[in-house]
Amino acid sequence: MPDPGRPTSTNAARRIDPTALQGDWINTESSPRGLARVLIERRSDALATRALGVEGRTLEGMEWFESLAVYASSSTGGDAVAFIAEHDAGSMPIDLHVNMSKGLLIVSSFQPPLLSAGPERRFAREFFRRADPESPGSSELSPKESAVRPLSSSSAVLTFGGTWRNTNTTGCGIASVSFALTDDGGTLSVQGRDRSDANDWGTATVEIYNEIGAVAEPAKIKASYDLGSMDVQLHGWVKQGVLVLALFRRFKDAIGESSYFDREFFYRTGRHTNSNG
């Protein structure tokens, strides 16, 4: 059944120009936690990425991998401000959630364990500036200590557990989310809000990641939803008692709208308390 709140246009999906994201990007920290450098090239309406890690890798040692999708800043936008890419070959599988803000590239990198009995899932959220043509690039970058302390289940519950309501009560995004811990990680239940009323996104499995180099064991979550005409990739964290969800919405049918990236903010309801700042 068509969504009454969505346009019924038969036009092709809106094209998104990825030009603004391409370039050579250098980590703003002299001792990166996850990635040191990111190269981005435009390939038609997609992007190709090559990332340099900080643990002995060279740019020549990692092949290019293409973006899965690019995203505008709104459903009517035409310029890309974000993309998602996955690299699952070799010894460094990694998922990238990337967006641009105020001239900086924000890269959230998710590293799953190589083996089921391997290390914990690791996460880093880092900021990149465009490389100076005269700069030596990554040769002066050195890795920061990347040890990760395993996140206890009680810590994850304290951080995310319970129900969270959107601070924006009038938008067309998400009304509320609820997190519950499971043996394999957690689940996230989402009550969406279309242009007329709230709607149930259902429950999705959540992956819990430990932040590289963190001293207070902060966690990040990652999940995805298939909503029929749209799929949503998201990740989230809690800062100063507020849950922040970064949402990558991709329309799968030709409705004349742009896939788009945005962030939504939530306050906790119920009895759970958060010990992380």
List the model feature ranges, each with a label.
Residues 1-33, 46-48, 101-172, 216, ...:
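Amphipathic/hydrophobic helical signal segments and adjacent flexible N-terminal regions
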Residues 19, 26-93, 158, 165-233:
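Central antiparallel beta-sheet cores of small beta-barrel/beta-sandwich binding domains
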Residues 88, 118-120, 226-228, 237, ...:
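A generic structural micro-feature
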Residues 95-99, 234-237:
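Exposed beta-sheet edge/beta-hairpin loop segments within beta-rich domains
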